[in-house]
Swiss-Prot record:
GO-annotated molecular function: unfolded protein binding
Compartment annotation: Cytoplasm
Encoding gene, per UniProt annotation: secB
Keyword field contains Isomerase: no
Protein's UniProt name: Protein-export protein SecB
InterPro entries: SecB, SecB-like_sf
Protein family per UniProt: Belongs to the SecB family.
Residue ranges the record marks as coiled coil: none
Amino acid sequence: MAEQQAQPEQVEFNIQRVYVKDISFECPGSPNIFKKEWSPEVSMDIDTKSQKLEDNVFEVVLTLTTTAKVGEELAFLCEVQQAGIFSVGNLEGEQMAHCLNAFCPNILFPYARETVSSLVTRGTFPQLNLAPVNFDALFQQAVLRKQSEEAKLNS
């Protein structure tokens, strides 16, 4: 009788739903901002949050806050919370953290980017194409920052 070798359990991953959780578009300088030469300084802030809904089911929310200024005047402020519900099984610790803070936001980003672009265009501004984001690098930076802070507290 051949011995059965224990095989690691296969990771389970499914996208249950992708949806817009919250949208905000503000154009405080209108209509005067439309008279100015369009040479904006655009910035984007990114935030991710996750919460466990039930066993192996998580909501991940990616928040993109995009601002454009012409000189000192705010042209627009656009905030999009793109969310998803994901089934994730057979991951623990840092692998689960990586999945929820890098892999899932990477799935959500194209949806959020399209929503931001659409809102900016509806505000009658030129189309805004946000550059891709390396969520793996952002996750690694957050891990290193946390380790550094813990080391400072323990010394």
